[in-house]
Amino acid sequence: MVATPYWPEVHHPNHQATHGRNGNVRYLSDRDRLKHRATFTGNTLVIPPQRRFELGIMQNTAGNIIYVVDSQRNFYVGRKNLGHFHHSSFMAGGPVLGAGTIVLGAGYQILEVNNHSGHYRPGARELKRVALAISTLGGDLNQIPFRVSGAGPDVVYGNGLALLDAAV
């Protein structure tokens, strides 16, 4: 688990950040979070049809979406809206197993999963946890490329199994 969010004061009982609870960045309730839950089939992201328009993730639209994986390995996705909806929105700034961006092609095909998150700043270990969650939720790691970003140059793995085999 990413033990400490980038803004550790979120755990303070008097947390008064200018985002989230008192600012413009939305924090999801448990009920609202369920609308963002996703699964996988092969190398395809599965979002319930009734939620696609609401989440702004349409089948014919390629692009980037953000994700987090909670401690129960549930996978949540959404469109980043700078200043309004961030990685921290999903779990109200609380800890997660992993976070980043999914690059989607048409038909919800996954072109890449990475660990780009300014709030949580996950590393390769967290991205491995994400890969395991994707596999548990129906994804085929043989078909999904992963990119690890960090202090050095990005490392691209042609598939999730290569990421899991890597020493990090």
Enumerate the predicted regions with their spans:
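Eukaryotic phosphoinositide-binding membrane-targeting regions
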Residues: 1-168
